[in-house]
Amino acid sequence: MERFYTCSCFFTDNIFLEEYKLHVRFVSENQFRKDYQNILRSLGCESESQFRDVIGKIQAEIERRQNHKLKSTERAAVIKEIYTPLHQHVYHLQESFLAPELLEMVKYCASSEANVQGLLKLIQTEAASRVFRFQVFRKEFCKDLLEELEHFEQSDAPKGRPNTMNNYGIVLNELGFDEGFITPLREVYLRPLTALLYSDCGGNCLDSHKAFVVKYDMHEDLNLSYHYDNSEVTLNVSLGKDFTEGNLFFGDMRQVPLSETECVEVEHRVTEGLLHRGQHMHGALSISSGTRWNLIIWMRASRQRNKLCPMCGKRPTLVESDGFSDGFTMDSDGDARANVSCSLT
């Protein structure tokens, strides 16, 4: 497998302060005070003790990121040793898991006459710009997968936080889903669609991913603040269980301020996936009852992100890592990132 890298901004940028619904950049305390102290005061962080508490949370998050590679590897090893799956079959993708309409679209995309206009006749277009809906899995598979995820959640095996904003969920590569499930799903069934729908933003050359499930519950995470993804294209599939409300809402692309954006709500439907551009700003409204599990696949195109990191908006400075990491690669001429450093652990 080709070597993948992380951008060094992972250790400084897009740190989410849940209490203030704010993403920040932290290089030093002096820089942070200069850039954010007045903003935080306007959001209710008025005292020095409150500010010091914010600094402490940021430093803890940076430490978590610095140790992420090591801790993830350790968790995966322990899970492999001590965890016994409930449904072993869900770890290996089979066409019988997939909805007929997805298989029909993939078949169409493989035909010589395939084009965007033809695919748009087979896929549902949402009111939000270039957001598409289609049934991904059969209900029986979603039921089995949810039972497996809940079985793992209730086990003594270690669990990692799925991302910097969700507190509850599962990182799927640590559980062993990447090679036999997520990778073939991306390569064989999703990339034919994204190649037509998102060719302008890397959809035709997706070569890595990060996949995780997130959980929303009345006693845990209820919603998700407005954000963009570390992906070129994202698939968000509602797996279940029983829930009310909690719709997604989409704004504009990340370059457009929220004040200039009109948001559009998009409903979650079990077994169905929503496909959208990673830089398309979005969030999740609060559920009002029940529990909802979502499968999220951040699909990445090194050819696209090697030019500009989607998280910091600059040419990436690479940090060595494991697996698919954040989807950056070294160009064949070595030019993509002359600055390559070892991960801080």
Swiss-Prot record:
Residues 207-301 form the Fe2OG dioxygenase domain. Fe cation binds at residues 227, 229, 282. InterPro entries: Oxoglu/Fe-dep_dioxygenase_dom, Pro_4_hyd_alph. GO terms for molecular function: dioxygenase activity; iron ion binding; L-ascorbic acid binding; oxidoreductase activity, acting on paired donors, with incorporation or reduction of molecular oxygen. Its cofactor is Fe(2+); L-ascorbate. 2-oxoglutarate binds at residue 292. The keyword Cell membrane does not apply. It holds the Pfam family OGFOD2-like. Belongs to the OGFOD2 family. The keyword Iron applies. Signal peptide: none annotated. Binds 1 Fe(2+) ion per subunit. It comes from Danio rerio (Zebrafish). This is 2-oxoglutarate and iron-dependent oxygenase domain-containing protein 2.
